[in-house]
Amino acid sequence: MFLYCINIYKNNILLESKKNLSRYGFFQKNTISEFMDFFSTTLLIKSTDNIFNIVEKEYKVTICKDIEYSYSIITDTEYPDRIIYNLHNELNKNHSELEIIFNKYSDAEIDKIGTINKELKETKEILNKTIESLLQRGETLDKLIEQTEDLTKSSKLFYKNAKKMNSCCVII
């Protein structure tokens, strides 16, 4: 989950931009930054929908148009759509705090639902393993009970046979 870029436009003119290009080398950063701006602006101009996504390999570009402002948000494909829409709503409310909003949404901890889902999956896996081990223990307990019953039957049979043998012999 990685947020690369947020661009804010007014009348299709770039007003403000915030990028995180830390995953790229020094000599690539300028070219990638220019490409992000160009690609976002082109999509914004050509789009007719108010909100749409374009996914290309490991990148997702989301264009959000409102009455006065438009936003371009570039993330990786793992970035959840619901977080992007929350980001869009927060930008609508106060786009002047782009730096703070960008830093807030760059943090993977912003996705509380995703974190809870991840913890639930881990808990589910642990519970499944525990239930499997309990079932295996139950199977071994069933085997032990069967063996105990067999041993009980064998001891009763042995006792009866020993009693018969002792009854035919007389002690002098």
Indicate residue ranges for each PLM-predicted region:
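Soluble N-terminal interaction domains of secretory/endomembrane membrane proteins
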Residues: 1-133, 168-172
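Alpha-helical heptad-repeat coiled-coil segments that mediate oligomerization/polymerization in large
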Residues: 116, 127-130, 134-141, 148-151, ...
